[in-house]
């Protein structure tokens, strides 16, 4: 991003600090950052009070304007500025920091649009989604970088779709963890958060639905209903025994009346259940033979968005796909990798109604749809 530097008599051009990063713009006027501590390695707050007073009295506004002009407007280094202003090089950083404190220099940031609106419009129109956020990612971004970017810029979008006092069902996932962590804090939202899936294993980690449910409830001043069961049990009889418990049954029923669900969309290729030792490669082959293309909350579904008929189906304790379809707003969150088949099937089956996705994934989804 380019810095635009302004003074009272001239518009500041592109400049930086000794080869400064081009991420901010500065102007020689008062502003909200006038009292912020200097980012150039020095701040007056680190000095004793007497030194601060002396320093402020020692430099005139005229000196500060000259130093700021030479440094920010003309792009001179601190050594050259020191010669012009007749001070030591070490004093230049003090001059520049004081210029900010007195309001002679102000920092502003040029607006950045993190979302790809054309792709959003196309996805919404072609796939019939209620709302879409396509987040731009830098070329060559790693999986972790894509997750971080989608979460950072997707969090406000997700928050806008969840009204105060709503019931929110939430699944687990790596991208979901980052997104929940970055949700704007609002203690007055008072949502009821419902864990949409039991714990994957005995080692409850930061990406599991329980931890994310608790984090969301804490950020939004809400209450939490936990599904205190394993996500996967040995057989249908064990599942039914858990669901027969009043405490578990109450949470299960509350899932049915959720206003919003926030879910990740998995594939057989990157299944967290294999990583956690719940499923084997052989299990995935069997699911693939039964037509599985995607997974939400441990529920594997086919190209039509219908749950695959397999022994696995009766071993899962999580929100059912039929329950999910009845929730008014289901937001799918995806970052990195081509999950087009899984996403398209989820949309076709009415499993998700809105989508947060990275730019590359959005393009792949449109190409998959056209083919």
Spans of features found by a protein language model:
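Conserved beta-strand scaffold positions in the cores of enzyme catalytic domains, especially
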Residues: 132-134, 193, 224-226
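Generic hydrophobic alpha-helical segments
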Residues: 67, 150, 154-158, 179, ...
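Glycine-rich beta-strand-to-loop/alpha-helix junction loops that act as flexible
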Residues: 170-175
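Extreme N-terminal segment that seeds HTH/winged-HTH DNA-binding domains in transcriptional regulators
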Residues: 2-14, 18-74, 80, 112
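Catalytic or ion-translocation cores adjacent to nucleophile or general acid/base/metal-coordination motifs
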Residues: 192-200
């Amino acid at each position: 991003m380019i810095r635009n530097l302004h003074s009272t008599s001239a518009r500041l051009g592109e400049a930086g600090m000794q080869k400064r990063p081009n991420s901010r713009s500065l102007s020689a006027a008062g502003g909200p950052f006038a009292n912020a501590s200097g980012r150039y390695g020095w701040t007056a707050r680190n000095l004793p009070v007497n030194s601060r007073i002396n320093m402020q009295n020692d430099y005139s506004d005229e000196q500060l304007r000259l130093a700021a002009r030479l440094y920010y407007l003309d792009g001179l280094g601190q050594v050259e500025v020191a010669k012009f202003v007749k001070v030591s090089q070490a004093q230049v950083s003090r001059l520049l920091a004081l210029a900010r404190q007195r309001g002679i220099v102000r920092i502003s940031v040029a607006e950045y649009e993190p979302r790809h609106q054309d792709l959003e419009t196309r996805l919404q129109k072609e796939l019939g989604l209620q709302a879409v956020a396509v987040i731009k990612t830098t070329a060559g971004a790693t999986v972790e970088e894509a997750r971080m970017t989608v979460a950072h810029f997707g969090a406000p979008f997700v928050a806008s779709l969840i009204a105060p006092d709503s019931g929110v069902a939430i699944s687990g996932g790596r991208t979901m963890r980052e997104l929940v962590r970055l949700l704007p804090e609002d203690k007055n939202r008072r949502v009821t958060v419902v864990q949409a899936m039991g714990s994957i294993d005995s080692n409850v980690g930061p990406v599991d639905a329980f931890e994310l449910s608790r984090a969301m409830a804490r950020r939004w001043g809400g209450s939490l209903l936990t599904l205190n069961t394993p996500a996967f049990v040995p057989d249908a009889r064990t599942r039914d025994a858990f669901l027969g418990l009043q405490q578990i049954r109450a949470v299960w029923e509350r899932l049915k009346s959720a206003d919003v669900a926030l879910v990740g969309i998995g594939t057989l290729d990157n299944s967290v259940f294999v990583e956690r030792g719940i499923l084997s490669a052989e299990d995935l082959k069997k699911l693939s033979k039964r037509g599985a293309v995607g997974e939400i909350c441990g529920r594997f579904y086919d190209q039509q968005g219908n749950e695959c008929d397999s022994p696995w189906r009766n071993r899962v304790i999580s929100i059912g796909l039929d329950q999910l379809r009845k929730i008014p707003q289901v937001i799918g969150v995806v970052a990195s990798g081509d999950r087009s088949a899984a996403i398209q099937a989820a949309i076709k089956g009415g499993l998700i109604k809105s989508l947060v996705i990275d730019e590359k994934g959005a393009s792949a989804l449109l190409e998959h749809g056209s083919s």
